[in-house]
Amino acid sequence: MNNRSAVRILRLPAVIQKTGMARATIYDWLNPKSPRYDATFPKKRMLGVKSVGWIEAEIDEWLSQRCKLI
């Protein structure tokens, strides 16, 4: 029996919905040249040539850590 849980990939609309943040904010957090860069925000993963996604567990952990800071 397999005890590992499946890795779930979230596309950008789901990340926007889960975080409550705008697309531009998320991409600012990912951009080291942006003054809004957040090194703790989970990195996007390339799913194909033009598609990216985020691992849901990483987004959930990031949100959990952010809640602890508030």
From Swiss-Prot:
DNA-binding region(s), chain positions: 12-31
Family matches, as InterPro entries: AlpA, Prophage_regulatory_activator
Gene Ontology molecular function: any one: DNA binding
Keywords: Activator, DNA-binding, Transcription, Transcription regulation
UniProt-recorded name of the protein: DNA-binding transcriptional activator AlpA
Entry keyword annotation includes Transcription regulation: yes
Disulfide topology: none
One record GO biological process: positive regulation of DNA-templated transcription
Keyword Transcription regulation: yes
Function summary: Positive regulator of the expression of the slpA gene. When overexpressed, leads to suppression of the capsule overproduction and UV sensitivity phenotypes of cells mutant for the Lon ATP-dependent protease. Part of the cryptic P4-like prophage CP4-57. Overexpression of AlpA leads to excision of the CP4-57 prophage by IntA. This inactivates ssrA (the gene upstream of the prophage) that encodes tmRNA which is required to rescue stalled ribosomes in a process known as trans-translation.
